[in-house]
Amino acid sequence: MRQTARFPTRWTAISSALVVLLCVLALILVPIPFVARSPGQTVNLLSTNERGKPMIQVDGLTTRHGEGEMRMTTVSITRADSRLSMAEALVAHLRADHDVLQREAIYPPGRSPQQVDADESYMMDTSERDAAVAALRAAGQPVTEMPMVSAVSAAGPAHGKLAPGDLIEKVDGKPVASVLDVGKAVRKHTVGDTVVFVVLRNSSVKTIAVTTVSSVSDRRAPAVGVTIDTGYRYTPTITYNIPGDIVGPSAGLAMALSIYQMVAPNDLIGSLRIAGTGGISPDGNVVAIGGIQEKIAVAERDGAKIFLVPAGNCRDISGVETSMRLVKVSSLKDAIAAIQKIRAGGTGIPHC
């Protein structure tokens, strides 16, 4: 009877061990619909990269860099082509400087990893352009708005002819100054007509003829298969040599301040060690971003003494402990004024 009683006990033990093993494997291997976000890195935009090239290079104007630092801040986040396990999520949740977020809050449902990468690269390109425009305007440099090709349909008649970034000067020999002007000029044609564009591409003027086809939304309306947005023309050439794995829109403010520091009549930053975050529009408005607490942590880790916080993010940092001075900014103009006051020992500087 003792022998027959041992078999259920043995099998119960084995079954329990298997259940525990399966639970452990599930904890380690089964992906869950969350991502982890943690402090990333900072990059001093007034320095050079690992190849010795300036992070931001401005040609065509006299420039300065100074002794100070203007650091952009980043977060590290689970990649779009990777999945977070429950164990990894638990570890991240227990760490004070990490966040665990719903995956769809970061990566739109239905978008492939390749599409997400393309979206983020496009946002970085747009942020670089808008930062340049905002900085040059703030420094008193002339900037002209022009209609610009922002996308070309691979199936449209302009494919291989017009290119994203082309600034449109004329349509059918007549100057155009806005997106609306280009649309009106194309709509004057009938389907099958040829539209002649004069565009500025990489400082070269090109004349390009495109035959219209039927619009997808109205078969009787002519179309050339491009998306037109507002672009900008200015004298200097601005080149970004920021590490290629940094993408997204949130470095706009830091890039704009760095360009302003280089081209403005007077030294803005001096020897200050500044970090910051925030998207920026061409007219200089600062936009709130995600991951503000992680960015504050990484900025302090890398030695920043002042951190520029978008006004829209102040509510996200209540309770954050830091030795840095947190300065609230709503615009590039605000940021410039605050830095000038700090250097002058002034008071009344906005803070979160």
Can you say where each PLM-predicted feature lies in the sequence?
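Terminal targeting segments of Actinobacterial cell-envelope proteins
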Residues: 1-11, 94-102, 110
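Conserved PDZ fold ligand-binding element
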Residues: 158-181, 296, 303-305
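Hydrophobic membrane-insertion alpha-helices, especially the h-region
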Residues: 11-31
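Terminal peptide-recognition signature
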Residues: 136, 158, 165-168, 197, ...
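PDZ-domain C-terminal substructure recognizer with occasional recognition of PDZ-binding tails
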Residues: 184-228, 318-344, 348-352
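Glycine- and Gly-Pro-enriched alpha-helical subdomains that act as flexible
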Residues: 262-264, 274, 282-307
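Short, glycine/polar-rich helix-capping loops at beta-to-alpha or helix-loop-helix junctions
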Residues: 308-319
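PDZ/PDZ-like peptide-tail recognition elements
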Residues: 39-64, 73-80, 100-153, 215-236, ...
